[in-house]
Amino acid sequence: MMDSQLHIASVLLDIEAVKLQPDKPFTWASGWKSPIYCDNRKTLSYPAARKTIQDEFARQIRDKYPDTEVIAGVATGAIALGVLVAQELNLPFIYVRSSAKKHGLGNQVEGAWTPGQKVVIIEDLVSTGGSSLAAAQALKEAGLDISGMMAIFTYGFTIARENFKKAEIELTTLSDYSTLIQQAANSDFISQEHVNILEEWRKAPSKWGVK
């Protein structure tokens, strides 16, 4: 585990972009009961956190994908993030809608690019990977060459790892679930009892809390 992952986890906890409530679970749109809720859009409201995340994305892209020609953000949560990263790297920016527009040009990918250009996709959060990989497919169909996808955070679900492996797309995240739980425990955000609950949830999230 890198120190940068712990630092990003600390940032997310400090601004409450990630909330941990093992005793008062959240209900996701999917219907799952969850002891964690992640809203990385909050990072945009805190200049120091925003700059930290922007700089870490840019640093890792320079290291991992030095030939990147375009940055793509996944709508809507990663559009602003993607713009920040593209500006830092002095690269063009495009974004991907969840579906093609029903009017006008009917675009799903917005912006200017040339087929064959190498693109890195920016996401705010990866859960199962379904919507993220749908965006990647749209970029492929638009003729772009996907170098990889980067996200602020992932829950680390097995299904997500399997989905990305099947799609043959490399996923890199600035922090992850295990790191965040460790940081939360180290910083006394949660007790060891809560750590155990959070670890159990991740093993079978769809069944957790079901009576």
Feature map (PLM): residue ranges:
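Active-site-facing substrate-recognition patch
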Residues: 1-64
